[in-house]
């Protein structure tokens, strides 16, 4: 593990709104990508320099002058009204897995803008017609959905399954889902060219979905990603698959990529603001006043609410013990007792949550040992898919101490370090995200040019 920087997340060297992209490439260079038309081979970093100008080494970008630190960028992303920004429509599918559990997949459906008479200038649409369709498709007992999201009809789902465009799967962060502004921004940018089919895979219990088995997601929870990608590959063996993870979703994606190695069906991947070293991030969140005060408690309380609303399925009596020795591969979720839920409501950090719930379920003695083992930095060297990595030096959640020395050893990773951007934000004066545009540009050029 790297040492924690002595600099606070806010410091004079990281103030400003003119950002710069820097490539972190190891001494062995980058993997060579094979281009379609001229049969040329080009290094991964040179591919970005030549074909993805937004991510060119030394490229500059301009953020909002009013959001001149990572703290302000991140706070604004979480607190401002983005209800009229990134107005995408989602059709929801309940995805069933081999262990009996479910999650939800929200498919971006651009054609619904026409069907529901969407007005781009006002973001208004035929809500009466939409609500009628939503009511007709909503499963009994399931939570009310976010705006512009409804369950798919059977015939609509069948039509989606016939689409054979390249697919981009988006994985959201720890306290989020498809409704998050940054996820909507990413989905909108990816779909704009019409080149991709886009879906957000909501983790179990997130984005107003239900948990149906006593199994809550962790950093090790890669099985749903694996099964979903395998399902999509089986349906259309010849189409390309891509994935992008944001924050904790980036951790799960990087862990999946490292576990799968050469077996992954993905053609390329991207991570945005991944806390590569969870232990380092946990220390940052506890030691840095801004991170501890403004972010850690909110995330812990979201996780607690997720447990609370799903106690019907997760709950066990007070005093419950594991029915088998818990391990990463065979966890035992015996900690979801009424007593622990009462305790959790006063948690002020994710570490407290993981100390009570996550670590015991996986057989770890404490949260810090869980963080140390579950960090995606442990699996970087076995990633075999070309992967774009974007992290910011002023990220108040991840901190400035990124694991360059380890990541740069893998030639399949293009590490784009930025000096500004905050956590998942990168907001410009119009509240658009530079990062989501950059990721969309990367996938578009990769799909267009690379074999």
Swiss-Prot record:
Residues covered by the AB hydrolase-1 domain: 166-430
Coiled-coil zones: none
Active site, per annotation: 247, 395, 423
Cross-link Glycyl lysine isopeptide (Lys-Gly) (interchain with G-Cter in ubiquitin), where in sequence: 114
A Gene Ontology cellular-component term: lipid droplet
GO molecular function: acetylesterase activity; alcohol O-acetyltransferase activity; monoacylglycerol lipase activity; serine hydrolase activity; short-chain carboxylesterase activity
Catalytic activity, as annotated: an aliphatic alcohol + acetyl-CoA = an acetyl ester + CoA
GO BP annotations, alphabetical order: lipid metabolic process; medium-chain fatty acid biosynthetic process; medium-chain fatty acid catabolic process
InterPro entries according to UniProt: AB_hydrolase_1, AB_hydrolase_4_CS, AB_hydrolase_4_sf, AB_hydrolase_fold, ABHD4
UniProtKB keywords: Acyltransferase, Hydrolase, Isopeptide bond, Serine esterase, Transferase, Ubl conjugation
Superkingdom to which the source organism belongs: Eukaryota
Sequence intervals crossing the membrane: none
Enzyme Commission designation: 2.3.1.84, 3.1.1.-
Protein family membership: Belongs to the AB hydrolase superfamily. AB hydrolase 4 family.
Further remarks about this protein from its record: Present with 2550 molecules/cell in log phase SD medium.
Role noted for this protein: Displays enzymatic activity both for medium-chain fatty acid (MCFA) ethyl ester synthesis and hydrolysis (esterase activity). MCFA are toxic for yeast and this enzyme could thus be involved in their detoxification by esterification.
Protein name, per record: Medium-chain fatty acid ethyl ester synthase/esterase 2
Organism in which the protein naturally occurs: Saccharomyces cerevisiae (strain ATCC 204508 / S288c)
């Amino acid at each position: 593990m790297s040492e924690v920087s002595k600099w606070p997340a806010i410091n004079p060297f990281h103030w400003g709104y003119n950002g710069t992209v820097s490539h972190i490439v190891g001494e062995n260079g980058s993997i060579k990508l094979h281009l379609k038309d001229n049969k040329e081979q080009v290094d991964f970093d040179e591919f970005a320099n030549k074909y993805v100008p937004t991510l060119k080494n030394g490229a500059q970008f301009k953020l909002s002058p009013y959001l001149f630190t990572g703290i302000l960028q991140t706070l604004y992303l979480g607190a401002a009204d983005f209800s009229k920004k990134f107005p995408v429509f989602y059709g929801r599918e309940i995805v069933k897995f081999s262990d009996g559990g479910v999650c939800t997949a929200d498919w971006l459906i651009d054609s619904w803008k026409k069907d529901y008479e969407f007005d781009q200038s006002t973001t208004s649409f035929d809500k009466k017609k939409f609500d009628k369709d939503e009511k007709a498709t909503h499963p009994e007992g399931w939570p009310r959905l976010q705006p512009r999201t409804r369950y798919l009809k059977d015939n609509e789902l069948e039509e989606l399954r016939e689409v054979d465009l390249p697919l981009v799967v988006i994985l959201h962060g720890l306290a989020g889902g498809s409704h998050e502004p940054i996820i909507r921004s990413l989905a909108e940018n990816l779909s704009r060219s019409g080149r991709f089919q886009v879906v957000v895979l909501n983790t179990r219990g997130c984005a107003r979905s239900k948990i149906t088995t006593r199994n809550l997601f962790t950093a090790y929870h890669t099985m749903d990603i694996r099964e979903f990608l395998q399902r999509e590959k089986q349906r259309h063996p010849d189409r390309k698959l891509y994935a992008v993870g944001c924050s904790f979703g980036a951790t799960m994606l990087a862990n999946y990529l490292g576990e799968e190695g050469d077996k992954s069906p993905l053609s390329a991947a991207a991570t945005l603001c991944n806390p590569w070293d969870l232990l380092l991030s946990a220390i940052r969140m506890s030691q840095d006043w801004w991170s501890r005060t403004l972010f850690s408690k909110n995330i812990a309380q979201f996780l607690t609410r997720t447990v609370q609303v799903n106690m019907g399925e997760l709950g066990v009596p007070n005093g419950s013990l594991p029915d088998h020795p818990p391990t990463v591969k065979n966890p035992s979720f015996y900690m979801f007792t009424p007593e622990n839920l009462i305790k959790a409501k006063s948690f002020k950090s994710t570490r407290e949550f993981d100390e009570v719930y996550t670590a015991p379920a996986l057989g770890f003695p404490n949260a810090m040992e869980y963080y140390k083992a579950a960090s995606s930095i442990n699996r970087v060297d076995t990633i075999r898919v070309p992967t774009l990595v974007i992290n910011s030096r002023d990220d108040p959640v991840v901190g400035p101490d990124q694991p360059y020395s380890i990541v740069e050893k893998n030639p399949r990773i293009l590490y784009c370090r930025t000096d500004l951007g905050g956590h998942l934000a990168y907001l410009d004066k119009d509240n658009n995200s530079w990062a989501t545009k950059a990721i969309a540009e990367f996938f578009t050029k990769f799909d267009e040019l690379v074999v």
